[in-house]
Amino acid sequence: TADVYQTEIEDGVTGYSDTLLSVVANFRNGGAPEGFNAQSMVGKSKRGEVALRLFAVSDHDTRTCVRAGFKTRGCLAVTGCASVVCSMLEGCTFDEALAITTDDVKTALDGVPVDKVYTIHFAIEAVRALIGDYLVRQGASLEELDAVVPCNSLSVPCMICEHCSLRSTRVELKMAEA
């Protein structure tokens, strides 16, 4: 579909759990929900592009994710991770969303192939970037952003993500302060 583009078709499905394949075959939250007010993008492009974008409609008063959607490019694992994390996000407060872990996503998919484990980190970093994007759209400063969505640029998840909208937003905010 236009929302999911698999670039690694030669990989087949070896190593993918039946649960993950079922999620990919039956995802319901592809695309950007109408009226989205937050979005994020994470991914890599070295040795093949794998990326995901998350979109959310968030309620300002309750700081809750009402609806979530995604677009992916790459492999089945990134599509499964994006779909599952969108399902987890719906109805969550921002604090609950930020508490979603790689283990939660891995468990929900009954695992991902060992060589695709980075896609779980992409999903979690995309959630963090989604919350960060919403806060910045609401006028949060860099200091306020760091208080809610701290970033360690030397952490493994951050280094895995060659492209990260949250990192780009931070750079823009730092440049504006300079």
PLM regions and their residue ranges:
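Short, thiol/selenol-centered motifs that function as redox-active sites or metal-ligating centers
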Residues: 47, 72-80
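Short beta-strand elements
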Residues: 50-60
